[in-house]
Amino acid sequence: MLSTKRKALDTGLQRRVRARRESSEEIEESSSDSAPSEIGRDDNEEEESSSDETEDEVEEEASESEEETSNDAAASISFGALAKAQATMSKPSKRDSKKSKKSNADGWEDNEATERKAGKKDQRDFTRSSKNAPTEISSKKAVSRRREVVPVKKREIRDPRFDPTHGPVDMGKIEKVYDFLVDYREDEIKKLRKTIKKTKDEDEKEKLKRDLLSMESRKKTDAKKRKAREILDKHRKEEKELVKEGKTPYYLKKAEQKKRVLLDTYGELKGRQLDRVIERRRKKVEGKEKKNMPRARRVVE
């Protein structure tokens, strides 16, 4: 492109120089022949018009050469490069996308209809003016478009051993079948006690102690349940024998069952052991009563 421009400019300069020479010769001839001033003026006008024409021709030639070179450059570009350029031009910039998002967020506040669309969350700012001010929540909550035409029951995974179709669960039989688990738990408790004595890390020791405490508490609860079940079974057997004799059966209430369990567990205790148990029970009951009391009445004057 540069070479063609230079050539065009060189030709233009040459033409201009020629025009100037002709004008100088004409001026000399006019001065020697003593021509009138009007003829000289006409010659000057002709010279100016010729110089303008030459300049226009030079510009036209330069533009034509530039067009030719640009066409050659476009023809040499590969289709892959053109496709990439087209893709980059078609993609929206990050700034434009951010602006569109901001405009959507502003439009949400103005348009209430869009707020009611299903699946859309309320994007308005509900920040409180102060920590003591009440929280503001939008009442325009989106309702889902999905509706249950035919209600379908949810599939429940259940254990066939404890299925209600087989009748009520007999805990006595289950305990007899899984009685070996009690021995396993006893062995685990013994092993835990040994490991607690051996461990030197305090954090690990605390963790093991917590595990031991939970296992022992579970063992105690299981023993209580077993004792309560034994008392109930004993009562049922007695009632069955009385029914055979022709008497009406007497069903124990839950409160009566608890009383009998307490009498059975603490009836054999005497002296200090009984006092300790009674004191522990009293504190437990007091704690429960305090929890149920309102805050104003908890403090005893």
Swiss-Prot record:
Component of the 90S pre-ribosome involved in the maturation of rRNAs. Required for early cleavages of the pre-RNAs in the 40S ribosomal subunit maturation pathway. Its main location: nucleus. Associates with 90S and pre-40S pre-ribosomal particles. InterPro entries: RRP36 (IPR009292). GO terms for biological process: maturation of SSU-rRNA from tricistronic rRNA transcript (SSU-rRNA, 5.8S rRNA, LSU-rRNA). This is rRNA biogenesis protein rrp36. Keywords: Coiled coil, Nucleus, Ribonucleoprotein, Ribosome biogenesis, rRNA processing. Residues 1-169, 199-232, 282-301 are annotated as: Disordered. Residues 43-70 have a biased composition (Acidic residues). Residues 182-272 form a coiled coil. Belongs to the RRP36 family. Residues 113-128, 145-164, 199-220, 286-301 have a biased composition (Basic and acidic residues). It is found in: Nucleus, Nucleolus. One of its GO terms (cellular component) is 90S preribosome.
